[in-house]
């Protein structure tokens, strides 16, 4: 076991809040492997970079010799985490939860060392609960305590319904820490109430309470709202090397440093040296390129990272059209407006986005900037269509019989 002040500082780096810091330092000074727990409800099949902030911190604990428990909340996912919700979440089927859980395991081992990771499912102990067990667990806390939680309080004061089972969610998540005898639990800042519930329940059941370490919610590509698939401002870890590389290169320099701080495997000292080099004249674009290659290599490999970099240079810095660009075919009865066409071939998410991109001067057809979203491209021809810097398609428009 490595126990040094520098190690403690590195483990705490990037955390938004640690409760309480002295207890973490005391646990680390014991010089024995600690049980580090992080729970994930498999409510969606794919992870994005926002999820990996937590996974990166778990990886750090592994590197310093601690035992990491990757907890899949297959039982609690069927209830639905009410955190941040103003309506009751619809529960998922067991089949959906288990299918999502399989993909989670495949994805997380791109970051975590499988030989140093214990994968647990909370159904292993929660399925054994009977009515008496559940009532005893519910009796450990009051409704008043539950209403201290912001989202519950807002729903209560505005007359929005709160289902009884939603009060059970934080209790069941907290009980996971009892079952696993966790020393430390990691989670996002939005999980603070649930994480502290683990501490309270461990005390109730006679165990030493866990330390809670909260990581920040990372901003999406827009630099404003948190990274989310529903907001389409995310970088998925299962995306292609070109997509990951291109999306990272599209972010602002300010957001780049935020991503590097939370997502790079570089140490705090190495990152500080990078920042200093930029202050001394290094182009931040070069730092961004190196970071983009690091992330692509993590989820693919180094060769793919170099290829993605080369393709990016060819496509965007030199303005070249990739030779291997696949041609799409669109068969229509009569010409359609460009705004509708862009959505139909998935270059935009909606017609309104198409109109906005055209008005911003971000749409080109065969290299010419288009200003009219109602423009209709003639049938029987092929076109190179570009939206912004990263979206490009070769399209053949054909006449329907």
Swiss-Prot record:
One of its GO terms (cellular component) is cytosol. It is found in: Cytoplasm. Keywords: Aminoacyl-tRNA synthetase, ATP-binding, Cytoplasm, Ligase, Nucleotide-binding, Protein biosynthesis, RNA-binding. SUPFAM superfamilies: Alpha-L RNA-binding motif (SSF55174), Nucleotidylyl transferase (SSF52374). InterPro entries: aa-tRNA-synth_I_CS, aa-tRNA-synth_Ic, Rossmann-like_a/b/a_fold, S4_RNA-bd, S4_RNA-bd_sf, Tyr-tRNA-ligase, Tyr-tRNA-ligase_bac-type, Tyr-tRNA-ligase_bac_2. ATP binds at residue 229. It catalyses: tRNA(Tyr) + L-tyrosine + ATP = L-tyrosyl-tRNA(Tyr) + AMP + diphosphate + H(+). A motif ('HIGH' region) lies at residues 42-51. A motif ('KMSKS' region) lies at residues 226-230. GO terms for biological process: tyrosyl-tRNA aminoacylation. It is an enzyme of class 6 (ligase). GO terms for molecular function: ATP binding; RNA binding; tyrosine-tRNA ligase activity. Belongs to the class-I aminoacyl-tRNA synthetase family. TyrS type 2 subfamily. Homodimer. Catalyzes the attachment of tyrosine to tRNA(Tyr) in a two-step reaction: tyrosine is first activated by ATP to form Tyr-AMP and then transferred to the acceptor end of tRNA(Tyr). NCBIfam families: tyrS. This is Tyrosine--tRNA ligase. It comes from Legionella pneumophila (strain Paris).
């Amino acid at each position: 076991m490595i126990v040094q002040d520098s190690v403690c500082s590195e483990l705490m780096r990037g955390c938004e809040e640690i409760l309480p810091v002295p207890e973490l330092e005391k646990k680390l000074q014991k010089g024995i492997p600690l049980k580090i727990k992080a729970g994930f409800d498999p409510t969606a099949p794919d992870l994005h970079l926002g999820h990996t902030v937590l996974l990166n911190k778990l990886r750090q604990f592994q590197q310093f010799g601690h035992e990491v428990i990757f907890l899949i909340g297959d039982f609690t996912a069927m209830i639905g985490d009410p955190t941040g919700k103003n309506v009751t979440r619809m529960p998922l089927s067991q089949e959906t939860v288990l299918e999502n859980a399989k993909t989670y395991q495949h994805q997380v081992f791109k970051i975590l060392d499988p030989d140093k990771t214990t994968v647990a499912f909370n159904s292993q102990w929660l399925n054994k609960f009977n009515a008496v067990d559940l009532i005893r667990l519910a009796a450990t806390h009051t409704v008043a305590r539950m209403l201290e939680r912001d989202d519950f309080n807002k729903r209560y004061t505005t007359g929005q319904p709160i289902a009884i089972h939603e009060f059970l969610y934080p209790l069941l998540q907290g009980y996971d820490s009892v079952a696993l005898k966790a020393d430390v639990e990691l989670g996002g800042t939005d999980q603070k109430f649930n994480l502290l519930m683990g501490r309270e329940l461990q005390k109730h059941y006679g165990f030493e309470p866990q330390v809670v370490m909260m990581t920040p919610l990372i901003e999406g590509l827009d630099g404003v709202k948190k990274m989310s698939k529903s907001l389409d401002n995310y970088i998925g870890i299962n995306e292609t090397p070109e997509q990951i590389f291109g999306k990272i290169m599209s972010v602002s320099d300010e957001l780049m440093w935020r991503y590097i701080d939370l997502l790079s495997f570089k140490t705090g000292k190495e990152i500080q040296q990078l920042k200093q080099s930029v202050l001394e004249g290094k182009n931040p674009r070069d730092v961004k390129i190196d970071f983009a290659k690091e992330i692509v290599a993590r989820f693919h490999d180094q060769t793919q990272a170099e290829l993605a970099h080369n393709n990016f240079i060819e496509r965007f810095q030199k303005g070249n059209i990739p030779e291997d660009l696949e041609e799409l075919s669109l068969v229509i009865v009569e010409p359609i407006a460009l705004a509708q066409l862009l959505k139909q071939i998935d270059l935009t998410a909606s017609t309104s986005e198409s109109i906005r991109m055209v008005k911003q001067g971000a749409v080109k057809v065969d290299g010419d900037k288009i200003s009219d979203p109602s423009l209709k491209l003639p049938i029987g021809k092929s076109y190179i269509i570009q939206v912004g810097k990263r979206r490009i398609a070769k399209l053949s428009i054909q006449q329907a019989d």
